[in-house]
């Protein structure tokens, strides 16, 4: 699909982390995206690739949005210098990611040696942190249990 640069940036800012849902749901990652791991995914201190969700996000964008610019911006949102066509707009998506991740101090995907521990970290909506007054927040959520197919 054809989008203006502005529209592409908006879509990428909104969809850059959609892959977290796909990854946690056990969706299959196509080999063409798995092969991009070394290009777009940073490594943690143990030498393991992190932020694999961006590959799932790009796969989602390719299938549903069908726009190369949006796909490339989503892919580069953790390493914006990897998108050499326009690093400036890639850094906008990086900023959007940092703002939206403010609900958690440190991602389990970043710090843990376990490949599955990030699945236990709840994804919280950033707007849950907004307080309308000086009173203690009455934020409530419920844990979602894995589905039992038996």
Question: Each PLM stretch: what is its role?
Answer:
Residues 1-150:
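Divalent metal-dependent catalytic cores for phosphoryl transfer on phosphate-bearing substrates
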């Amino acid at each position: 699909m054809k989008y203006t640069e502005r529209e592409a940036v908006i879509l990428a800012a909104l969809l850059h982390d959609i892959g977290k849902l796909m990854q946690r749901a056990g969706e299959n990652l196509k080999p063409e995206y798995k092969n991009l791991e070394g290009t777009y995914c940073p490594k943690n201190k143990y030498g393991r690739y992190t932020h694999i969700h961006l590959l799932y996000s790009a796969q989602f964008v390719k299938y549903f949005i069908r726009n190369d610019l949006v796909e490339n911006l989503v892919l580069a949102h953790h390493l914006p210098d990897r998108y050499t066509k326009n690093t400036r707009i890639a850094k906008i998506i990086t900023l959007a990611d940092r703002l939206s991740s403010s609900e958690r101090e440190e991602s389990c995907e970043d710090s843990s040696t376990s490949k599955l521990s990030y699945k236990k970290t709840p994804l919280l909506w950033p707007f849950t942190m907004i307080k309308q007054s000086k009173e203690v927040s009455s934020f409530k959520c419920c844990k979602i249990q894995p589905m039992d197919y038996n």
